Amino acid sequence: MDYFTLFGLPVRYPVDGSLLASRYQDLQRQFHPDRFASQPERERLMALQQAATINEAYQTLKHPLKRAEYMLSLHGFDLGNEQHTMRDTAFLMEQLELREELDAIERKADAQTQLASFGARVNETVKQRSALMIQQLDSQQWMDAADTVRKLRFLDKLQQQVEQLEEKLLGFE
């Protein structure tokens, strides 16, 4: 059973977050291992396994990029385990330039202002690529969507690096 079906949701990218959370809580109550404490070991293990599957499914469907990767896996694109090499050299060069720019920001006198501007640009790029990905998933352009998800992975990592630098500049690190 796929994760969408497990939660009683249609297999499509947009997910009602509050409905997902509500169904998650219902399933957690239904399959919580404590409810099976007095049952035979086999049933306890099955409940434990089901609870783990529910947790994994919820984390996957809750996170936009993981949800897209999961949808693609349902259509034969296993991005989590692939050894695919990014062939879009223009995109890769852009990523290298962005990382160099991020590295240089730390040494600037107005680093926080520069970082805020840089972060806003990255967020806008993520927003645009996410909109493209949603369009591709909705129109079942799986190969194109897989390529966009691969690019969003790079951008997601870049966003994390922006957050780490922000914490460092603010003295939280």
Swiss-Prot record:
The keyword Chaperone applies. One of its GO terms (cellular component) is iron-sulfur cluster transfer complex. SMART domains: DnaJ. GO terms for molecular function: ATPase activator activity; protein-folding chaperone binding. It comes from the Bacteria. Keywords: Chaperone. Residues 2-74 form the J domain. One of its GO terms (biological process) is protein complex oligomerization. PROSITE patterns: DNAJ_2 (PS50076). The keyword Oxidoreductase does not apply. HAMAP family: HscB. PANTHER family: IRON-SULFUR CLUSTER CO-CHAPERONE PROTEIN HSCB (PTHR14021:SF15). NCBIfam families: hscB (TIGR00714), PRK05014.1 (NF003449). Interacts with HscA and stimulates its ATPase activity. Interacts with IscU. Co-chaperone involved in the maturation of iron-sulfur cluster-containing proteins. Seems to help targeting proteins to be folded toward HscA. Belongs to the HscB family. This is Co-chaperone protein HscB. It comes from Serratia proteamaculans (strain 568). The gene is hscB.
